[in-house]
Amino acid sequence: MNGFVNWYTASVKRSPRLTNGIMTGSLFGIGDVIAQVGFPEKKGQKYDLARTVRAVVYGSLIFSIIGDSWYKFLNQKVIVKPGKHWTNTAARVGCDQLLFAPVGIPMYYGVMSILEGKSLVDAKKKIEDNWWPTLVTNWYVWPAFQLINFSLVPVHHRLFSVNIISIFWNAFLSFKNSISPSDKKVPVNFPPVPE
């Protein structure tokens, strides 16, 4: 493992965008494979390579750039009290969860919908259906991890550490994104009928 970390550190210093793009895209792809193989929407559903490619494209070309820039911004600009490590770390986690997550989640659903060839109306519907439940789930997972990440991990490794945990988060996102509105369970009396 130490050899890999040394290789990654050298690669990210030499070519940060390329290294982060390859790593992030690969791990988004792994998350999608886990979602498709481990949690298929329908029994006997075949593996969809195009879906995995979309996840890799999103991770490589969009999230890697935004995520790396965001973590550097937090480290450089979110300093509540110079020299107060835990205060600054808590402020960074707060910014991450209250500013980035509420925007990043709809960005994911919107971009994935467009990459799937869906209309802007469909993308908007996907966001409306999934934003709040995904954000709440995000708050169960990420604040504790980000507290550790922002306090112990050097800034140039933060995207990588997030990407490792994100394998499972990406599997969750990929699964949520793959559920069509017709797959969702609705009450028998839906839409509600006045009594």
Curated annotation (Swiss-Prot):
Give an example GO cellular component term for this record: mitochondrial inner membrane
**Record localization:** Mitochondrion inner membrane
What's its membrane topology? Multi-pass membrane protein
Q: Which residues cross the membrane?
A: 21-39, 55-71, 98-115, 159-175
Role according to the record: May be involved in cellular response to stress. Required to maintain mitochondrial DNA (mtDNA) integrity and stability.
What family is reported?
Answer: Belongs to the peroxisomal membrane protein PXMP2/4 family.
This one is known as: Protein SYM1
